[in-house]
Amino acid sequence: MNDSTFTLGIVGARGHTGAELIKLVAAHPRLELAFVSSRERAGQRLSDHHPEFQGELQYENLDADAVAAKGVDAVILALPNGLAAPFVAALEAAKPDTVIVDLSADYRFDNSWYYGLPELTRGRYNGQKHISNPGCYATAMQLAVHPLLDLLAGPPQCFGVSGYSGAGTTPSDKNNVELLADNLMPYALTNHVHEREVSVQLGVAVEFMPHVAPHFRGITLTANLWLNRVQTREQIVERFQQAYAGEPLIEVLDEAPWVSRIAGRHGAQVGGFTLAPGGKRVVVVATLDNLLKGAATQAMQNLNLALGIDELTSIPH
């Protein structure tokens, strides 16, 4: 058995997702963390923020050329939208076979990149070195809708609520705990980037209405689906059970999942399956941790896939 190790760098390591990635890498037997780039923490030791990492590795403030000069096997870009391109260009020029996993939305509409939602797109992976990690809401939406794709009579209507960690670490109304207290904050109620992302991936128009809540982590996504033929609840449940059979990170529940029960867990739960009278409308609920299955855990699945390692290595399940 090949037990070679691979070198990895993380760009954007200070954020919530970067912190979760570092925990997963610390538990990985075949990944060596070669560098972590963070402008705000440059010069600080990684072990001071992540005790699971012992040693002298320090955060560095690396531009695209400096990242490329490191010559690592793989790079995870955990940057805000719009910042990935210079890093991708520099890595391609310096070492074209570098595996790049990008967590932003920058390449989710680029067909030359593998769109990595393994439970749904694993069959499309054929050695691509560039992997676009799906959005957190987009992951939940697709898991809730995909098993019923051929039954849809119209656009899925998806009401989403996320914890405020989804708004990142840069201060804004959407992560201001005082403004969020006892509140639910709607935003980007049409044309959200995840609405466009899911519409492209599923090949059907999706209507998505996101909200931010006062809890820190976790997404609940309620999908209202009109069907083109009458279904029983048993038929609906069977579709989901068959779709996610053998997928350790996807749990199909009879009851509607709670976001409080998924926080800190690496998988997703799908359930509820409530049929309206007449059998041609069903409501499905999906939950996941936006920092884990919605970001870091999925990135680790994709990285493992690209490096030829068992997909769930270092992921508790």
Curated annotation (Swiss-Prot):
The keyword Metal-binding does not apply. Pathway: Amino-acid biosynthesis; L-arginine biosynthesis; N(2)-acetyl-L-ornithine from L-glutamate: step 3/4. Its main location: cytoplasm. One of its GO terms (molecular function) is NADP+ binding. Keywords: Amino-acid biosynthesis, Arginine biosynthesis, Cytoplasm, NADP, Oxidoreductase. GO terms for cellular component: cytoplasm. InterPro entries: AGPR_AS, AGPR_type-1, NAD(P)-bd_dom_sf, NAGSA_dehydrogenase, Semialdehyde_DH_NAD-bd. It catalyses: N-acetyl-L-glutamate 5-semialdehyde + phosphate + NADP(+) = N-acetyl-L-glutamyl 5-phosphate + NADPH + H(+). One of its GO terms (biological process) is L-arginine biosynthetic process. It is found in: Cytoplasm. Its EC number is 1.2.1.38. The active site is at residue 136. It comes from the Bacteria. Belongs to the NAGSA dehydrogenase family. Type 1 subfamily. Catalyzes the NADPH-dependent reduction of N-acetyl-5-glutamyl phosphate to yield N-acetyl-L-glutamate 5-semialdehyde. HAMAP family: ArgC_type1 (MF_00150). This is N-acetyl-gamma-glutamyl-phosphate reductase. It comes from Stenotrophomonas maltophilia (strain K279a).
